[in-house]
Amino acid sequence: MTLTIDLGNTRAKLTLFSAQTTARTTGNTAAQTAILEHNSVTHQHLVAQLQQMLEQHSNIQRICWCAVGTVPTALTLFLEDLPCHVQQLLPTSPPAGITIGYRTPETLGADRLAAVLGAQSLLPHHTVLVIDAGTCITFDLLRSDGHYLGGNISPGLDMRLKAMHHHTARLPLVTAQGAHPSWGYDTLTALRSGAIWGIHHEIMGYIAQVRAKYPNCCAFLTGGNRYDFNISTQTCNFADESDAIATDNRIFADEYLVARGLYALP
């Protein structure tokens, strides 16, 4: 089995891949997934939870991981002492066959690289555009020849709603939940619809721009807010790559892209 660890600023996502994993399907991708909240006080708790998972699954032979920000010393020491193969994804040292066009790879989030690697593990002969909708929205592009062209970062949904409230005198703070018609019929729906539909058109605009240059590009939507923007998506349950030919209206949704990318490391 392979354990992947996606270590973010406030949480870690641990995903187990069994030997029977079918790379192209979603349903049986992960034998087990755990989301662990962590901060400077609970790093030891994170290590303890990781130790518990390793004890429960003694056949884990490989750990592939990536981290955003500072890696807890306790975790580093723990991983160094493990008898199994441990591999960290670093944008400054990409896997064989991958080249980085980002001018400052040391500032590139490893999870962003892992996500495009995960998308390309599903469609190895396609250019892939990964849109990760979380606190911020990231757009990352990996060409079919393995060249990471770069990416953009845009404010996420909650950030946009809060910014309109904090940087104006009279606009209220609205939540993302609620009516969001194409055209707002009052101030609350105008703010919410402006943010949600603005992101919708932003995402669709990026996809159209990339596909104009790379017609074989497939787009992937991931992240906690991936279903909030009125975008029609399909799961990654396709039999083979020929079943996933990019079209103007085909976008795949997958929550395991980062884990898939780590699992695909050579």
Residue map of PLM features:
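N-terminal phosphate-binding loop and adjacent alpha-helix
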Residues: 12, 24-74, 158, 163, ...
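Intrinsically disordered, low-complexity terminal tails and inter-domain linkers enriched
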Residues: 18-35, 232-249
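Adenine-nucleotide phosphate-binding core of ATP-dependent small-molecule kinases
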Residues: 179-218, 251
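Short glycine-rich phosphate-binding loop at a beta-alpha junction
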Residues: 59-69, 86-88, 214-225
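Glycine-rich phosphate-binding loop plus the immediately following alpha-helix
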Residues: 108-110, 114-127, 149-192, 264-265
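Glycine/small-residue-rich loop that forms an oxyanion/phosphate-binding "nest" at active or ligand-binding sites
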Residues: 67, 79-119
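Gly/Thr-rich phosphate-binding beta-strand-loop-beta motif of the actin/hexokinase/Hsp70
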Residues: 1-27, 119, 125-148, 164
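Glycine-rich phosphate-binding/hydrolytic loop that grips phosphoryl groups
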Residues: 248-266
